[in-house]
């Protein structure tokens, strides 16, 4: 391993790329000189100062965004790809096998080629180790890895909410997920339906009835721990806030609350970024903003025979950039929690 790890961020002008840079600037390896931020790249914004896009990143404000191409990214020890879906695969193929590539896009998340082609409409590029360390067995696959696929933000929330119950066979393999999210999850490109006048004071569902691209990813993660095919009904809802996801997940169960609570305590007791709420308390997005934490609550609707599991995360941290840095730490053999906080910014 190099004495100083040179890190590049492709797609640095976007929200995910900017959040990766924010976390890297606060990483102890950066403060100690063991991690250096190299190329920061963009597409249409290439040639402009990073500070025009992320004025909060003052230590890097004068950095000029370079074009996103393999020649610019070559020679770095770690490359974060924060690119639109479908753009990572070709670029990754041009980088060396020894380069740690952490892809925040969807290109390598799905193992099922047919599912990829159905939801994304292009040839499947393959799959990489999945960057959700809390998934059973994931840490072993991430340690020493040189290719990592960061999970989607909605799947992160839904999987963390449901994994313990599904892994212990305490719920039926048919789940419903309704998740509200802020506008940053849609990226930074200008869109009419994301204008302030369209979003403020309003909430709307979108990509309903199995149409959202994160649906097969949620099903894949649940199937991996249950050993059964899992059906997922997923409804995303856009709300007028910039950050945060609150996922309310339900599934049929005959298990008593005590058994379900015990399963969650067993699964998450030693997890550094998971906070299982005390009984009677419920997660809120405001408590996790800016942190890599996931706050989770579990309850049973006894009259309906339904598990209700709720997860709150910051979609830009635990849902993207934080998971990317957490996975980088594992891949490099560094303490998993370095550079990541469980303390949110409130109010």
From Swiss-Prot:
Pathway: Amino-acid biosynthesis; L-arginine biosynthesis; N(2)-acetyl-L-ornithine from L-glutamate: step 3/4. Keywords: Amino-acid biosynthesis, Arginine biosynthesis, Cytoplasm, NADP, Oxidoreductase. Signal peptide: none annotated. Pfam families: Semialdhyde_dh, Semialdhyde_dhC_1. It is an enzyme of class 1 (oxidoreductase). One of its GO terms (cellular component) is cytoplasm. GO terms for biological process: L-arginine biosynthetic process. It comes from the Bacteria. GO terms for molecular function: N-acetyl-gamma-glutamyl-phosphate reductase activity; NAD binding; NADP+ binding. SUPFAM superfamilies: Glyceraldehyde-3-phosphate dehydrogenase-like, C-terminal domain, NAD(P)-binding Rossmann-fold domains. It catalyses: N-acetyl-L-glutamate 5-semialdehyde + phosphate + NADP(+) = N-acetyl-L-glutamyl 5-phosphate + NADPH + H(+). Its EC number is 1.2.1.38. The active site is at 153. NCBIfam families: argC. Catalyzes the NADPH-dependent reduction of N-acetyl-5-glutamyl phosphate to yield N-acetyl-L-glutamate 5-semialdehyde. Belongs to the NAGSA dehydrogenase family. Type 1 subfamily. This is N-acetyl-gamma-glutamyl-phosphate reductase. It comes from Mycolicibacterium paratuberculosis (strain ATCC BAA-968 / K-10) (Mycobacterium paratuberculosis).
